[in-house]
């Protein structure tokens, strides 16, 4: 059998896979439910409680012809998906909007109160925190927790959407992209996790650079194959270099800016209350107990830091953080709670150890991010955001499962060296003292990080592009 062009080949291959799935589907019931009562969370640091309850301005009885399913597979991706959903519900006529978070239970979406919105799928917190690909241990923990079974059930849900005239928006990397491709629906793909900055221009190098250079993109051949589907109506990348490299492969990828920068405040309305202090933001991550290990590492390092002024340490906590446990760790490291001291920047409590003050606040990341001079950060999304605000940061990798040495080095390369990765306590202290005392060095790092992360305003452009190319 001969095919006139590559699109016919793709359609034949998709039809072949679809027939296999149909056979599998006959052997299993169709699963679909809206999850309303799951309450635990592992959201990106500081985002969830800052989001107001969102009411729909969309008329469910309008003549909208499409329903939309958004599939996302990461905590940062959940935040991007939330912004897309908010804009859809307020501006665009759609029958129904559904979201399927593939990592965690998607509690961040509970702030949306609309009759034509729902969370669907089999949602649960994974033992690895969603990083089963980082280690064999993480994969095995997720496997025995039922990850593969739940993924297959979610897969069957997605396969049932084509007959209901759904459009799909995949946010993430391979898994949501594959789900969108196998659905038989037309789809858009927002590929945020991968960037060609990680292999093309340093700092440093890794063995994987040769592999990516050979491919010409950090996106793998099987992912590029899925992107070439005639049902893929728009591709959006996190930065210009990644989009351009895909364009060289005759793939029409667009770059509108990084939507991660749309979710942090750029104003410092209360910073005057702490402007006379050296200011440090401590980002320990949102996955426990890893976050507690990160906190202990940072507190041990801060014991020996020598600076001229008193130090304000901003410690924003994620919505799922156990504040009592955090306070116990502060106490174990020599900090005492100061009930009569207030800095009036939204803190829940103040802790002191000699010339260092720690301000503790739940869901205050958005409010505090732009108040710091330097960050100590063992996290993913939040580190990228403070870098985009022009704040250099330092990391010291731990045991994981998320923030391992390889993760930290990749992140540093992604952000052009704006995150300094340290191997030990002494190196971290030396780098921190330099950053707190040398303004010229900070300015150099600021320019690199801000350029890599891009400007605000990408979310609106992304939604407009998807609406034009997928929904009309």
Stretch-by-stretch model annotation:
Residues 47:
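Histidine-centered active-site/metal-ligand motif
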Residues 2-25, 29, 34-38, 50-472:
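Nucleotide-activated sugar donor-binding and catalytic core shared by glycosyltransferases
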């Amino acid at each position: 059998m001969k095919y006139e062009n590559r699109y016919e080949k793709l359609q034949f291959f998709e039809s072949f896979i679809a027939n296999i799935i149909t056979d599998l589907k006959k052997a299993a019931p169709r699963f679909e439910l809206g999850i309303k009562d799951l309450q635990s969370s592992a959201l990106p640091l500081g985002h969830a409680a800052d989001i107001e309850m969102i009411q729909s301005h969309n008329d469910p009885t309008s003549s909208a012809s499409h329903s939309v399913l958004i599939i996302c597979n990461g905590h940062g991706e959940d935040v991007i998906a939330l912004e897309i959903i908010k804009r859809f519900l307020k501006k665009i006529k759609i029958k129904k909007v559904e979201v399927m978070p593939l990592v965690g239970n998607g509690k961040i979406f509970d702030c949306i109160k609309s009759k034509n919105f729902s969370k669907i799928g089999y949602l649960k917190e994974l033992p690895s925190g969603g990083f089963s690909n980082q280690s064999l241990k993480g994969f095995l923990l997720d496997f025995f927790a039922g990850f593969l079974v739940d993924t297959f059930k979610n897969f069957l849900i997605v396969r049932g959407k084509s007959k209901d005239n759904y459009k799909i928006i995949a946010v993430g990397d391979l898994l949501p992209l594959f789900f969108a491709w196998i659905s038989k629906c037309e789809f858009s793909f927002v590929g945020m996790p991968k960037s060609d900055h990680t292999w093309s221009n340093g700092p440093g190098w890794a063995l994987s650079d040769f592999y990516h250079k050979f491919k010409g993109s950090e996106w793998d051949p099987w992912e590029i194959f899925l992107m070439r589907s005639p049902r893929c109506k728009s591709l959006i990348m996190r930065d210009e270099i990644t989009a351009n490299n895909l364009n060289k492969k005759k793939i029409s990828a667009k770059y509108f800016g990084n939507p991660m920068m749309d979710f942090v405040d750029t104003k410092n309305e209360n910073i005057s209350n702490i402007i006379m202090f050296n200011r440090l933001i401590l980002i320990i991550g949102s996955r426990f107990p890893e976050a507690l290990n990160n906190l202990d590492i940072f507190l041990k390092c801060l014991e020996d830091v020598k600076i001229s002024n008193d130090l304000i340490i901003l410690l924003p906590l994620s919505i799922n953080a156990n504040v009592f446990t955090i306070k116990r760790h502060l106490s174990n490291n020599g900090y005492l709670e100061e009930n009569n001291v207030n800095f009036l920047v939204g803190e829940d409590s103040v802790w002191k150890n000699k010339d260092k003050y720690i301000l503790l606040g739940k869901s205050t990341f958005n409010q505090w991010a732009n108040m710091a001079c330097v960050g100590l950060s063992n996290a993913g999304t939040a580190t990228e955001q403070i870098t985009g605000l022009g704040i250099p940061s330092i990391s010291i990798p731990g045991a994981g499962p998320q923030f391992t040495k390889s993760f930290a080095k990749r992140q540093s390369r992604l952000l052009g060296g704006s995150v300094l990765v340290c191997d030990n306590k002494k190196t971290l202290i030396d780098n921190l003292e330099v950053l707190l005392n040398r303004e010229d060095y900070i300015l150099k790092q600021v320019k690199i990080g801000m350029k890599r992360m891009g400007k605000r305003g990408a979310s609106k452009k992304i939604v407009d592009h998807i609406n034009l190319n997928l929904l009309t």
